[in-house]
Swiss-Prot record:
GO terms for biological process: antibacterial humoral response; antimicrobial humoral immune response mediated by antimicrobial peptide; calcium-mediated signaling; chemotaxis; defense response to bacterium; defense response to Gram-negative bacterium; defense response to Gram-positive bacterium; G protein-coupled receptor signaling pathway. Disulfide bonds join 37-66, 44-59, 49-67. This is Beta-defensin 1. Belongs to the beta-defensin family. InterPro entries: Defensin_beta-like (IPR001855). The lineage of its organism: Eukaryota, Metazoa, Chordata, Craniata, Vertebrata. GO terms for cellular component: extracellular exosome; extracellular region; extracellular space; Golgi lumen; membrane; microvesicle; sperm midpiece.
Length: 68
């Protein structure tokens, strides 16, 4: 009987998370923009990109630039 209540509670939590936008569930498996920048050979900078580099994206949820 306790198992069925636990399963029902878990199901309710998952459904409420999906109804609110599902940020937790969709965030699983996604890499941060900082990780993507650094792993592709870039640098995350808050200031302008150095000479001979270009902006390749963003870092820290759009607060910095990925320079490569």
């Amino acid at each position: 009987m306790r198992t069925s209540y636990l399963l029902l509670f878990t199901l309710c939590l998952l459904l409420s998370e999906m109804a609110s936008g599902g940020n937790f569930l969709t965030g699983l498996g996604h890499r941060s923009d900082h990780y993507n920048c650094v792993s592709s050979g870039g640098q995350c900078l808050y200031s302008a990109c150095p000479i001979f580099t270009k902006i390749q994206g963003t870092c820290y949820r759009g607060k910095a630039k990925c320079c490569k």
